[in-house]
């Protein structure tokens, strides 16, 4: 049978507000083997659906929407968007779930958060798996990403939104139409005006512009 997922929420704190953070929970809730999957900058926890289904028989797989993305709350003050806040939030998630040890799979930003936590004493990370990220990021990369992420754009139809996003993610390769839908749909949302948007706060780009990689 296909493993089923649970859509869950916990409350965590920023410096000025209580935030609701969403996560998708797969596999046995009492399984001590826990894999935490943390997505990239503009993505959401649903990126890991296919992987989580494959691993749910052996692991409890937890896939959060980092604050500012997906079903999680947005910050009142965008200055808080950054690795320190994300690290605190995810440690708070694990603490609230009573989880003291995890294997951590981080894609891009998720890998950076994992590295930051793994560098702390008495951290909960048993194994750290990095995908699409390394210890160095060039200033030109940051500038390019911040410019793209910070644009508050919308599309009048889902087809238009999907077509645009397929161009953005074209470097991922020759995906099937089903794979494209699985990749793109969870990270798109329809607003109150009927317009389609990417499912994140465009103000997350502000913290990127403040980074000096030198």
Q: What is the meaning of each model-derived region?
A:
Residues 1-36, 57-59, 99-100:
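Alpha/beta-hydrolase fold catalytic core
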Residues 15-19, 24, 50-53, 63-105:
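Active-site loop/oxyanion-hole signature of alpha/beta-hydrolase fold enzymes
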Residues 40-50, 61:
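Serine-hydrolase catalytic-loop signature spanning alpha/beta hydrolases and amidase-signature enzymes
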Residues 42, 66-70, 135:
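Alpha/beta-hydrolase active-site loop signature
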Residues 100-139:
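Conserved hydrolase catalytic core segment
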Residues 125, 133-160:
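A catalytic-pocket lid/entrance helix-loop region that shapes and gates access to the active site
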Residues 163-214:
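Alpha/beta-hydrolase
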């Amino acid at each position: 049978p296909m493993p089923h997922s649970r859509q869950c929420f916990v409350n965590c704190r920023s410096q000025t507000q209580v935030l609701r953070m969403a996560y998708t929970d797969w596999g046995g809730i009492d399984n001590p083997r826990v894999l935490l999957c943390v997505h990239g900058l503009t993505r959401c926890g649903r990126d890991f659906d296919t992987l989580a289904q494959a691993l749910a028989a052996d692991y409890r797989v937890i896939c959060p929407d980092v604050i500012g993305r997906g079903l999680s709350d947005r910050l009142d003050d965008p200055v808080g968007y950054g690795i320190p806040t994300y690290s605190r939030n995810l440690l708070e998630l694990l603490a609230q779930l009573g989880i003291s040890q995890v294997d951590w799979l981080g894609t891009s930003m998720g890998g950076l958060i994992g590295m930051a936590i793994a560098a702390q004493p008495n951290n909960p990370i048993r194994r750290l798996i990095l995908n699409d990220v390394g210890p160095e990021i060039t200033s030109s990369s940051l500038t390019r990403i911040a410019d793209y992420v910070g644009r508050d754009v919308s599309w009048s139809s889902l087809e238009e939104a999907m077509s645009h996003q397929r161009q953005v993610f074209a470097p991922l390769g020759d995906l099937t139409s089903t794979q494209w839908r699985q990749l793109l749909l969870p990270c798109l949302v329809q607003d109150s005006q009927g317009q389609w948007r990417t499912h994140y706060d465009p103000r997350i780009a502000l913290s990127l512009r403040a980074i000096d990689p030198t």
